[in-house]
A protein has these predicted regions:
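Short, flexible loop segments at the rims of nucleotide/cofactor-binding pockets, characterized by
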Residues: 9-10, 47-53, 107-114
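Short, charged/polar "capping" segments at the starts of alpha-helices
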Residues: 13-15, 38-45, 81-83, 111-112, ...
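Conserved nucleotide-sensing/catalytic segment adjacent to the nucleotide-binding pocket
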Residues: 30-83
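C-terminal accessory "lid"/substrate-recognition subdomains
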Residues: 140-205
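Glycine-rich P-loop/Walker A and Walker A-like loops and their local beta1-loop-alpha1 context
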Residues: 1-43
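Phosphate/Mg2+-binding loops and adjacent switch elements
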Residues: 76-155, 159-161
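P-loop NTP-binding module
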Residues: 7, 14-15, 27, 35, ...
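Structural motif
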Residues: 6-11, 34-39, 73-79, 106-109, ...
Length: 205
């Protein structure tokens, strides 16, 4: 099972981003797009793709780690962010699944205008491997440059990329390949520990 988590407020752009990834990538297998139920969602219009609307207040995330499939989970921007991520991380740990990538799609136009939204996105980016800078048409170029530099000065390891047009990622391969770059370890599975002492191991009572 390949699983990806996406966060952001411009859901039309996120939808286009996922559809672009599905159409341009082979070997994804069965694809399920899990999105907040209150939002209409544009499908990629491909046979192997199914939409899975969910209620963030009642959803229980259950996946088969051995299934040859791909899941995209879009976090609800109107529901408590940290609560959703903690619930998701707990459910995924029970399934023994780590997301291959956690992605934040930044609405640059709205973020430039709102300090509150900038704080929300900063929280998202703390958990992210990749940050996609989107909806830049009406955002100041200096703001977009300074926004990225802000996180570089803080030594955030996440990768910053651009969304072009309606939401097409410039480097789709970077979104789908494994390789965590996130600061948070919330989604990391704990390392397995042996049930019995290894040979030569001394256990003190």
């Amino acid at each position: 099972m390949k699983l990806y988590i996406l966060m952001g407020t411009h859901l039309a752009e996120i939808s286009q981003c996922i559809n672009h990834l599905v159409k341009s990538t082979k070997d994804l297998g069965e694809v399920k797009i899990h999105h907040p139920a209150e939002y209409e969602w544009a499908s990629a219009s491909q046979d192997q793709v199914s939409l899975q609307p969910y209620d963030p207040d009642t959803v229980l995330w259950v996946f088969d780690p051995d299934r040859p499939a791909t899941a995209f989970i879009v976090v609800d921007p109107k529901t408590d962010l940290i609560g959703q991520l903690e619930h998701l991380a707990d459910n995924l740990a029970k399934c023994q699944i780590e997301p291959l990538k956690v992605v934040t799609c930044v609405d640059c136009e709205r973020t430039e205008q709102s300090a509150k939204l900038r704080a929300w996105y900063e929280a998202c980016i703390y958990y992210s491997d990749v940050v996609l800078l989107g909806n830049r048409q009406n955002a100041g170029k200096s703001f977009v440059r300074e926004y990225q530099k802000h996180f570089e000065r803080l030594c955030y390891p996440c990768l910053f990329l651009l969304l072009k047009g309606a939401g097409n990622p410039t480097q789709p391969g970077e979104l789908l390949t494994s390789g965590p770059r996130r600061i948070s370890q919330m989604f990391d599975l704990p390392e397995s520990t042996p049930d019995e002492p290894l040979p030569g191991m001394v256990i003190e009572a």
